[in-house]
Amino acid sequence: MVPESKVTEIYCMADDFCKEFALQQKKYMIEDKKTRHRNKPNRISDAEIMVILILFHSGGFRCFKHYYKEYVCKHLKHLFPRQVSYNRFVELEKEVLLPMTIFIKKVLLGTCTGISFVDSTPLRVCRNQRILIHKTFEGLAERGKCSMGWFFGFKLHLIINDKGEILNFMFTPGNVDDREPLKQDKFLENIKGKLCADKGYIGQALFENLFLNGIQLVTKVKNNMKNSLMSIADKILLRKRALIETVNDELKNIAQIEHSRHRSFNNFIANSLSAIAAYCFFEKKPAIDVNFVNDGQLSIF
């Protein structure tokens, strides 16, 4: 369980952000003079909703309904005194999707250290036997293939640094090529140095494009490709690529970013974003110890 001091810390960060976000959002809102609005605030604030969603993935729970009714409403009553019913809380989740996304992007993400890892992981929304009768994500989720076989759902594309901190993320349908997000400048914003990936990211055009933008894509060589010279440092970094697999594992097993009980797309996005936010608050993240020795030699890349 998360200690109350940590809950207070998360709430203070979320509340400060929500207040600033509301002020900035109000500047760009278009006023509707034809229709009168009550503008009555919700009983529970956006910051409290965000914190409750984040705590769900930090406590090892697997059923959100049980978590909210049996844990939040009973044991966290003193921290969240203005609680709403479970059905009302589910309705309010969609109202914090935009603040939650910007909160993660602008506050919680780590900084690039010059060594980054990229990978994608499938987010299955149903079993393969139920694909033809699945209706919740009809027109959104797609069939895809990963190292574990075929699946139906979405892909989560992650970039992390050597400290295990998430640098950026993107959700795509399951049939999108892993290399497509790397072709978007917004996904690679503030990413510099070496970017280690698996064989699914091999592509000469992609390598040249990234190299011109200050990013060196480091991948293994396929069996039917000509061998290429690679420095010892790059070979060692490729052996440490399991770091991002560990991050994916924590998102799925400690947090619960993947399950098949979603009833709407908004619920899926709220669950996924809160899982990523919860991981950013983990005190202990998987990391590798990287030390550079200055030998006085000049390296030309």
Predicted regions, residues:
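Short alpha-helical elements
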Residues: 1-301
